[in-house]
């Protein structure tokens, strides 16, 4: 958060303060423990994939770096809270009426497969590596397993929003 040259990283500080605030809203131990586990495992898979294929590296050159893994469960909980806030506000914005489910089906089947295609294009130079094949199969499998497009597209939107700030940092 504080650079040794004396400067403070305001984007990182603000992002972590936002995530800390999200952690205090609607706490449910049972639900949160599941999300913490999913975040840790999912983050571990993502970091394993990215560092083993050398799509990205960290200054420590660890593959994956253990110090980054605790950020994933925290971000997962924050995304869950943000998604629930967004979900509640959607119906309010629609004048108190429930947003039609077809809108979410359309949004899901346009946005999420487009994201998967973009990720495959991003990793195109590593498609011959087993890690990329595993992650591609996971992305396609999760995409096809959608049972609640409203929940999933709201989670996708919240995760994308928070991810922009985390990645920009």
Walk through the language-model features, giving the residues of each.
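Aromatic-rich, lipid-facing transmembrane alpha helices and their immediate juxtamembrane interface loops
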Residues: 1-169
């Amino acid at each position: 958060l504080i650079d040794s040259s004396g400067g403070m990283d305001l984007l990182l500080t603000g992002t972590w303060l936002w995530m800390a605030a999200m952690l205090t809203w609607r706490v449910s131990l049972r639900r949160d423990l599941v999300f913490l586990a999913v975040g840790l495992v999912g983050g571990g898979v993502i970091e394993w994939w990215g560092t083993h294929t050398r799509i990205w590296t960290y200054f420590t050159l660890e593959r994956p770096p253990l110090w980054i893994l605790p950020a994933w469960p925290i971000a997962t909980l924050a995304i869950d809270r943000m998604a629930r806030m967004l979900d509640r506000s959607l119906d309010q914005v629609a004048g108190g009426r429930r947003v039609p489910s077809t809108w979410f089906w359309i949004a899901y089947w346009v946005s999420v497969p487009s994201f998967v295609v973009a990720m495959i294009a991003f990793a195109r130079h590593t498609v011959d590596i087993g890690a990329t094949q595993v992650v591609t199969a996971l992305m396609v499998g999760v995409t096809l397993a959608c049972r609640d497009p409203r929940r999933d597209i709201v989670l996708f939107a919240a995760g994308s929003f928070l991810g922009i700030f985390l990645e920009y940092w």
